[in-house]
From Swiss-Prot:
It catalyses: glycerol + ATP = sn-glycerol 3-phosphate + ADP + H(+). The lineage of its organism: Eukaryota, Viridiplantae, Streptophyta, Embryophyta, Tracheophyta. Its main location: cytoplasm. This is Glycerol kinase. It comes from Arabidopsis thaliana. One of its GO terms (biological process) is glycerol catabolic process.
Length: 522
């Protein structure tokens, strides 16, 4: 990329933390700040966030990152051209447009409280859990925003009353942040982008607008929904009271779509982001592909109001890095997440132990809300290193399950190979710093894994979207620059095919052991 003065900022609002990163014209991070926030677990299977705490975390991250950039000699004042925003998807907020206050804590994407609503709809609607797939690409599941919104409408009196009074508005985290950053109760913009909207189960994938039949079927009033915009356009300006008033918000994507853009994935290329969960997306180009193997049809990105829409197949895994957090916080096997690599490397195998982290059920490609976690194959020989390695393997097995489904769905309709005839999985996210995890992934797939120099591509993707909208970058800068690829690390498979097949068969047996466990009682 040609050098040019100026910077792009990126808000990365994730499941467990918020970050703000400032990039220069060469897409290099020059400063960043990260803040963790509180996770609430009011009941088994429930996960909530405080929207006000998230809002404050964004303010703090912006201010601190600006201070760091200035302290390091970067002329950010007057040089920040725009900001992009990426967020945890599906997490649902309903708030009062008159007071600006949330009417309930945010219900997080992995929250499973809506299982009874899902079962009810599956029985009532033709096609069962696939009733809405034709229009929105998604099955009926606790995962998506529509079910969370229905729960709030049915169970929270403040939400019911506000809807009756015309005072309630709904949004995912991007909508909540943009509304507050552009004025809040004083004219804040009520918008979302096409990728976040595609995860609500309410947007028609072909028209990219709210699906009126779906709204009618579910009884959701259209007036509480935000306007849908593309991923790369000037949405509005940041209001007074924020560290960067007057700066344009020019890009917005859900986190996994941002990572795909950050990895510059073209048609036929896939990426896997390893975070709290793991999310694998395959860019299928301009035509949505309907999955017959447990995947979701969704958007990849739309880089401008008049730009073509790129679609994707997605496999969403609920628990990946969260299993490592569980080892740390609940079992005390490790003191920090980074310790798991050395602990797992103390043994050459799991010793026959298989761990399936179905804490709140299983997502793609199994879609079993009745599943619960299991750890099998334990003997007196088993020690904590075997458990740690089994946890790492569980992340990789789940990714392989999704990739196998992608190959079945898209193998004939879209290329899954590069010019050398091999499949490459591009990876990103904090957990990919774990070299052992990446080698296990390559071994279990039997294919190379490519890790970029900057593994936090989610924030980079949001920055790219904003930079494109204001002319800071061109698409060629993103999709044709080979500089990042030159420095990528490639992990190649070293496991014998016979061993791989045996391990995969054992994993599938372990997964089956998780089924029908949700109703177990003491």
């Amino acid at each position: 990329m040609a050098k040019e003065n100026g910077f792009i900022g990126s808000i990365d609002q994730g499941t467990t933390s918020t970050r703000f990163i400032i990039y220069d014209h060469d897409a290099r991070p020059v400063a960043s700040h990260q803040v963790e926030f509180t996770q609430f677990y009011p009941e088994a299977g429930w996960v909530e966030h405080d929207p006000m705490e998230i809002l404050e975390s964004v303010k703090v991250c912006i201010a601190k990152a600006l201070d760091k950039a200035t302290a390091d000699g970067h002329n950010v004042d007057g040089g920040l051209k725009a900001i992009g925003l990426t967020d945890q998807r599906e997490t649902t907020v309903v708030w009062s447009k008159s007071t600006g206050l949330p009417l309930h804590k945010a219900i997080v994407w992995m929250d499973a409280r809506t299982s009874s609503i899902c079962r009810r709809l599956e029985k009532e609607l033709s096609g069962g859990r696939s009733h809405f797939v034709e229009s929105c690409g998604l099955p009926i599941s606790t995962y998506f925003s529509a079910m969370k919104l229905l729960w709030l409408m049915e169970n929270v009196d403040d939400v019911k009353d506000a809807i009756k009074k015309g005072d309630a508005i709904f949004g995912t985290i991007d909508t909540w942040l943009i509304w507050n950053m552009t004025g809040g109760i004083n004219g804040g913009l009520h918008v979302t982008d096409v990728t976040n909207a595609s995860r609500t189960m309410l947007m028609n994938l072909k028209t990219l607008s709210w699906d009126q039949d779906t709204l009618k079927t579910l009884g959701i009033p259209a007036e509480i929904l935000p306007k849908i915009v593309s991923n790369s356009e000037v949405i509005g300006e940041i209001c007074k009271g924020w560290p960067i008033p007057g700066i344009k918000i020019a890009g917005c994507l859900g986190d996994q779509h941002a990572a795909m853009l950050g990895q510059a994935c073209r048609k036929g290329e896939a990426k896997s982001t390893y975070g709290t969960g793991a999310f694998i997306l395959l860019n299928t180009g301009e035509v949505p592909i309907k999955s017959g193997h447990g995947l979701l049809t969704t958007l990849a990105y739309k880089l401008g109001p008049q730009a073509q829409t790129n679609y994707a197949l997605e496999g969403s895994i609920a628990i990946a890095g969260a299993a490592v957090q569980w080892l740390r916080d609940s079992l005390g096997i490790i003191k920090s997440a980074s310790e798991i690599e050395d602990l797992a490397a103390m043994v050459d195998s799991t010793g026959g132990v298989y761990f399936v982290p179905a804490f709140n059920g299983l997502f793609a490609p199994w879609w079993r809300e009745d599943a619960r976690g299991v750890c099998i194959g334990i003997t007196r020989f088993t020690n904590k290193s075997h458990i740690a390695r089994a946890v790492l393997e569980s992340m990789c097995f789940q990714v392989k399950d999704v990739l196998d489904s992608m190959n079945k769905d898209a193998g004939e309709k879209g290329s899954l190979n590069n010019g050398k005839g091999e499949f490459l999985l591009r990876v990103d996210g904090g957990a990919t710093a774990n070299n052992l995890l990446m080698q296990i992934q390559a071994d279990l797939m039997g294919s190379p894994v490519v890790r970029p120099v900057d593994i936090e591509t989610t924030a980079l993707g949001a920055a790219y979207a904003a930079g494109l909208a204001v002319g800071f970058w061109k698409e060629a800068d993103i999709f044709e620059s080979g500089e990042k690829a030159k420095n990528s690390k490639v992990f190649r498979p070293a496991m014998e095919e016979g061993i791989r097949k045996k391990k995969v068969a054992s994993w599938c047996k372990a997964v089956e052991r998780t089924f029908d466990l949700a109703d177990l009682s003491i």
